[in-house]
Each structure stands twice: as C-alpha cells, then as structure tokens.
Amino acid sequence: MAFDKKLLDIVACPVCKGKLEYDKTTQQLICKADKLAYPITEGIPVLLENRAVPLTESV
C-alpha cells in the first residue's frame, strides 16, 4: 500500500507539532526541527515518539 501524500496536510510531528516531509526512498516522514524520522508501515505513518529514529548527518 502506498503512502498518500495528501496526509501531509493534516499530520504533524507528535513532539513539536511541526510540519513533516515525506522521504520516498526511506519510506519515512521527517521532522527537520526535531531531527526525527517516523516510519511508514504498509502505507500508514507510525507517528509515535518511541518509534521515531534520530536522523544522522548523512540523511
């Protein structure tokens, strides 16, 4: 199941409530403010703080 980009208009980072960006390559939603990546599983964003992955300098 593909991620629906229209969701970006209504979802927000659960930590800072900021805008998320979709990374098609890694299938993650990225919060640049908190430097966190949230996984997308079977087209569904997992917006749980304990499932977020810290971004590295290379991302």
Curated annotation (Swiss-Prot):
Source organism superkingdom? Bacteria
InterPro entries reported in the protein's UniProt record: Trm112-like
Tell me which Pfam families the record gives: Trm112p
What are its GO cellular component terms? cytosol
What SUPFAM superfamilies does the record tag this protein with?
Trm112p-like
* PANTHER family in UniProt: PROTEIN PREY, MITOCHONDRIAL, ZGC:162634
> According to its UniProt record, which protein family does this protein belong to?
Belongs to the UPF0434 family.
Q: What is this protein called?
A: UPF0434 protein Sbal_1685
